Amino acid sequence: MQNKNDIITENTYCSPLHFNYMKSNGPTQNDDLVESMQQIESAILIGGWKKTKLWWELVSLMKSPSDYEIVRRLWLASPKSCRENLSVLRAVARAACISGEHMEGRTILRKAIIIAANKKRKQKSYLFKGKRYVKSMLKKSEMTKNQNTDSFEMHAKKALHDLNVVLEDFGVKTFLISGTLLGFVRDGAIISWDKDIDVGVFSEECTENIENLFSSLSNFNVRRLDLSSDRVRVTHETGVGIDIFPHYMEGGRRWHDGAATRWWNTPFSLKKMKFLGVDQWVPDNPELYLDENYGDWRVPEPNFDARLDAPNVEITDQDYFDSLIYFALLKTIVNDKQKMKHRYISLLRQLGETTWLSRI
């Protein structure tokens, strides 16, 4: 039986995280934003400490570095059980880093990395229960993976169509970029390990803030991805996330920004091609775009890191760039990517990290 605080928390801000609630009650003005953050803070304080979606929604509402104070205040007041929750740790670390508090963020990430490594060791110790069991689980995993890919492509087609309808009404064309363009050109499909869609827009076509274009729509939820760039993520009602990267001209090149890096391309125009059965804009010379972004893109490389490996990358925020290596290490441990794990450990050692890395 739920106690009173659990019921209040669930009714106050678990249902808000349902897509339809987020659209009907999402903040559009500064006063609404402050009120929304205060509502989430209250929901966490009365018992929602381990409800990770609350923490992530709070972080997604941050509009300036000063908003980190709410997250920090909650973190300092949180119980021990909350401080061992990997998703909460990652959310708080992200809030710290996007606010420029990198030392705080890295301290939290070190703890998260050690916890994740310990959990992974325990999971592996349970795995060795006989070859037949392991083989069976791997087969089931592959079947589920194929089913998930088919489902994602179906939802992605709908999400991309609806996105284009919205933006074309404002004279804005979306075009495939990054991993989505790579999958289209090389494989004729979405890359199997991609979990979202990447599109670009020309900044000169965006006469209005992209967030504002989606704020009143019932089938999309929109959030800025960080405080240092204009890129946004729109989440379709199907659950598909689409990252939108404005491409702007500077120094005779087209650039688009990430959190701590940016990438250049030779200026290009657009052409339409069939993607997932629908017409979609792509760079007029997609192979050149991919050459500049990936180098040898014709051979699949699951361990490619666009911040480290892209031939056209430029670091714009060294502190944040270094912090992202901690996030990357945490992700590789959770996903059991051994090759990349050792790569990020080596990079952290170059940054001066020593003793604690031996524990992972």
Kindly label every feature range from the protein language model:
Residues 49-79:
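Alpha-helical adaptor scaffolds
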Residues 164-197, 204:
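Active-site nucleotide-donor binding segment shared across nucleotidyl transfer reactions
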